[in-house]
A protein has these predicted regions:
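Alpha-helical transmembrane segments and immediately membrane-proximal extracytoplasmic
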Residues: 1-237
Length: 237
């Protein structure tokens, strides 16, 4: 590596801060948002929420393992079809169509669908929310491995939001707290960069969420990955 860890952290923070400032400035001048909907600053943080905190982080790590498993399987499939790019891209399209039919919120990258989920998540069962999160992680890995263009950051955030709402539906805790901790834990575990995780998520979470965001991202990023999955997490860096 050309620079040390403190310099890299500084670069990540400055890059994220610059991006947030640019989005905020453009939004103030021309209207609109930064692409990701923002959660309300009003939320409940009490001992009840924090009593579930480690459980949320554990669930986020489990979701991260599912993401890495999907990435590994998708990569193997992509290698099998790398000389048949038209076939692989058509196959990815069929997978997206199937996902859209059974779980409509899994379409596209997730920014718009995240806004829909924020306003209507109580209409879905915890089972559907969990399936939506898992399907989103599977589909984004299939698309990338089978030749489609794009990245996994926004889909991963959406998956964390869906899984967080599922956790809130099961336990009855404050949904925004659950979503913040779940999303930060999932993203932090996969990316292994807690500072960058918090900086990116502050694009859709107000600063009052800094403690569950930072706590979940740091704890999850310190949990070791299975040795065979180290390469897969680089796709989310």
């Amino acid at each position: 590596r050309l620079v040390g860890k403190p310099v890299r952290i500084f670069i990540y923070c400055m890059g994220a801060a610059g991006g947030i400032a640019a989005f905020a400035g453009l939004g103030a001048l021309f209207g609109g948002s930064a692409g990701l909907p923002r959660f309300d600053a009003k939320h409940t943080i009490s001992w009840i929420q924090w009593a579930w905190f480690l459980g949320i982080v554990a669930a986020a790590i489990l979701a991260g393992l599912c993401y890495l498993f999907f990435a590994k399987v998708s990569e193997k499939l992509g290698e099998m079809l790398q000389n048949h790019r038209i076939v692989s891209c058509v196959l990815a399209g069929i997978c997206i169509a199937a996902g859209m039919y059974f779980l409509p919120l899994t379409t596209f990258s997730g920014e718009h669908e995240m806004g829909e989920l924020m306003s209507s998540w109580e209409e879905y069962s915890a089972k559907i929310l969990i399936l939506t999160a898992l399907a989103k992680m599977l589909l984004v890995n299939l698309c990338i491995s089978l030749g489609w263009r794009g990245g996994s950051i926004f889909p991963l955030i959406f998956s964390g939001v869906a899984a967080g709402y599922a956790f809130a539906a099961i336990t009855g805790i404050d949904p925004n707290f659950a979503v913040a901790a779940m999303t930060a834990g999932l993203y932090g575990y996969v990316s292994r960069k807690p500072v960058m995780t918090v900086a990116v998520l502050l694009m859709c979470f107000p600063p009052v969420y800094i403690f569950p965001l930072a706590g979940a991202a740091v704890i999850a990023s310190k949990v070791p990955m299975p040795s065979k999955m180290h390469e897969e997490e680089k796709n989310c860096r």
